[in-house]
């Protein structure tokens, strides 16, 4: 049995990684993280992909001679927005966002390079699908940075409503 109070959960889960290194294979762990003051026995998984788009730099006055990595990114985003990920009765909808976007070049030059991070919160139904979609859409440019599979302990309790006095806090 162990108690883990998470540190750095939004920036790399450094506390959880340190814990795992010192306590590999702990049979039972209570994880304390700031999630609405409720108990949960299931949580969404996480998948973070870094995707690089490579264009061809050229002066913006002659765009026909280059390829904008920003336009390639826009095509990718339009395709990703069109995907309907399955909903899950327990964990709800799959959600995603672009957490980091980088393209550093002069404003009058077609961007030769753009990198983004796509962060997914996956469900029982969508965990594997997300990986397949990203592999197919971004091809070899997509690199899985880290991921945590969706978790459920087998109980019927997913989340317990907080007490009224806790809501006031």
List the model feature ranges, each with a label.
Residues 1-48:
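Acidic/histidine-rich catalytic neighborhood of metal-dependent amide-processing enzymes
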């Amino acid at each position: 049995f162990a108690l883990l109070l998470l540190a750095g959960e939004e920036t790399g889960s450094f506390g959880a990684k340190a814990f795992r290194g010192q306590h590999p294979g702990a049979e039972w762990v209570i994880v304390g993280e700031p999630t609405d003051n409720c108990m949960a026995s299931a949580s969404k998984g996480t998948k973070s992909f870094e995707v690089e788009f490579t264009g061809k730099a050229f002066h913006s006055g002659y765009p026909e001679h280059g390829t904008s990595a920003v336009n390639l990114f826009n095509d990718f985003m339009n395709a990703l927005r069109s995907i309907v990920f399955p909903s899950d009765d327990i964990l709800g909808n799959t959600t995603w966002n672009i957490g980091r976007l980088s393209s550093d070049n002069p404003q009058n030059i077609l961007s030769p390079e753009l990198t983004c991070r796509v962060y997914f919160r996956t469900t029982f139904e969508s965990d594997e699908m997300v990986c397949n979609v990203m592999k197919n859409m971004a091809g070899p440019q997509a690199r899985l940075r880290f991921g945590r599979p969706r978790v459920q302990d087998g109980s019927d309790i997913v989340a317990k409503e907080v007490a009224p006095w806790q809501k006031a806090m």
